[in-house]
Amino acid sequence: MKQSKISRRSFLLGLGAVSAAAVLTACGGSSSASTATAASGSSVVYRTLDQIKESGTINIGVFSDKNPFGYVDENGEYQGYDVYFARRLGEDLGVEINFVSTEAANRIEYLQTGKVDLILANFTVTDERAEEVDFALPYMNVALGVVSPDSNVIKSLDNWNSKDQMIVISGTTAETYLTENYPDIPLQKYDSYATAKNALENGNGVAWANDNTEVIAFALQNKGYTVGISELGNKDTIAPAVSKGNDTLLDWVNEEIKSLGDEQFFHKDYEETLVDTYGKDYEEDLVVEGGAVQ
């Protein structure tokens, strides 16, 4: 492992009710849907908790290429920290889960258009996002980090060479943070974790900025890379998200997170899905139990 090199501590269009009903029916949901309006003015479509129960299926958006948080294994099964949590939610709700592969840039869109009922995809809570979706209680801590090849370890973003490009994923907090705080750093934007990872490996950018959990995992899993900046900007939290105004589902998820805290569920989740990547050293830094940030 390379832990010694890593500091301890990565068309929002609204649809009408008729279109929403078609989407929800196709996903196995109720033909009846509720609507609300987000801060952007977009019409938001969602299924209430009772409608989800009645349908027998909940549609949950997760990543399919972001090991160890959400990915598809060699058997075609979804796995990871977020997926482990999702399966427990489905079990306790008494419904089947329809996993919907999502990218960072379409998490809000998928909620607003009713394609998913819930997002569990390393979704960092921000004020801007909270105007468009409703976040439940958090279940993980996170900050931003920067990973680069061992031959050019990036330890500071000050005095950045304007010819060098930073790799980011569109729709992430890393993109927003760098745009607002380091506008002179050229950003090379990709739509997915996999394409950003490939870009770094192919030398298309000098470094990759993302959630520190993700860049640390990348460096631990890939020889020749170092996380030179393990905490960039503010410390934030990861939380589930539902469509704006879907209070019945939001309240249920919040109560579930509180209840799961009593059994230290997210520590068990960490042990099952993250310990092989991070070891024990990061567990208390990352895990949030019962929605209570220490």
Where are the regions that the model predicts?
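N-terminal secretory signal peptides
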Residues: 1-6, 13-26
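Ligand-binding clefts/hinges and TM-proximal coupling segments of bilobed small-molecule sensing domains
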Residues: 29, 173-190, 227-229, 257-294
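Extracytoplasmic small-molecule ligand-binding "clamshell" domains
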Residues: 41-122
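A ligand-binding cleft/hinge motif common to bilobed small-molecule-binding domains
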Residues: 109, 123-131, 180, 201-202, ...
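Periplasmic-binding protein-like
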Residues: 141-148, 216-257, 276-294
